[in-house]
């Protein structure tokens, strides 16, 4: 149920006329009273009439975007797809970037966009089911479209087929006779990362492959680098690395190179995203490609369709595909681990006089 003037007035302990004066920016309100009203508005998630009337009387033709840090390649490419599609359809865009994934941060971001009188909002950030439902209920006057929510969440959303992509990655490495896997996932709050990791686990178990180690990364290259450096320092042997995005895979390749481990002869590495730069990694990265631009564009089309003809909840899943490059190859009997080489050298030393 939508929050009303009366709800705000009741919580703040003032009249509805006072609430009206505060929301209209009138000067003849005591600061203590103004603070109580604004605190009540914030707590209840109330949208002042001025914004609500603007939304109902005439469209501003502005689409709001709530986003993660746009220094992340995937996030930035999705936002770019949203902007491009919006502009082609005669809409402007307004962007706000989250400091974290808390419910309060999402609420503040949405209120900031409402203040700019946006027509609807696309949430370009991971949201759990509870927060998604809360936002839909609290901001019921707005059309919200999500991009990273758990499967089965009753909200409008668009996503790529993370499950199929993760399956393709494991099967590709299994076909290359790899059997000792390291998994580097994304942040635990990301639904996309969880789907990928769960699919990896299912396929590894199905084919009898070993998960040697698992690390949780943060989508940045440095976290992939740290994971591999830790494994090398511990002397742990592995022959394949599944990475939840291409940026972390860049860090993986760098760490393996620093350790003198050959890719793909000794260790095969596969990423996820298919960002354009991945073809220029050393070696060029095998990856699961998802179309970020199309994802952003689809979100805009779904949103506008729901604005014009609100009805049943829509969920769209976009396909992905495997792009094979030089970071993966078939394991051969001539490949040796670091531990095997050290053992061989030790045996030779013992035979010497």
Predicted feature descriptions by range:
Residues 36, 73-91, 165-169, 191-210, ...:
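Short, solvent-exposed amphipathic alpha-helices that sit
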Residues 47-112, 117-120, 198:
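Amphipathic helical "hinge" segments at domain boundaries
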Residues 120-121, 126-133, 182, 194-276, ...:
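Hydrophobic alpha-helical
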Residues 123-168, 247, 273-285:
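Flexible loop/hinge segments that line or gate small-molecule binding clefts
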Residues 169-209, 213-214, 314-330:
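An alpha-beta-alpha
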Residues 232-353:
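Flexible loop/turn connectors
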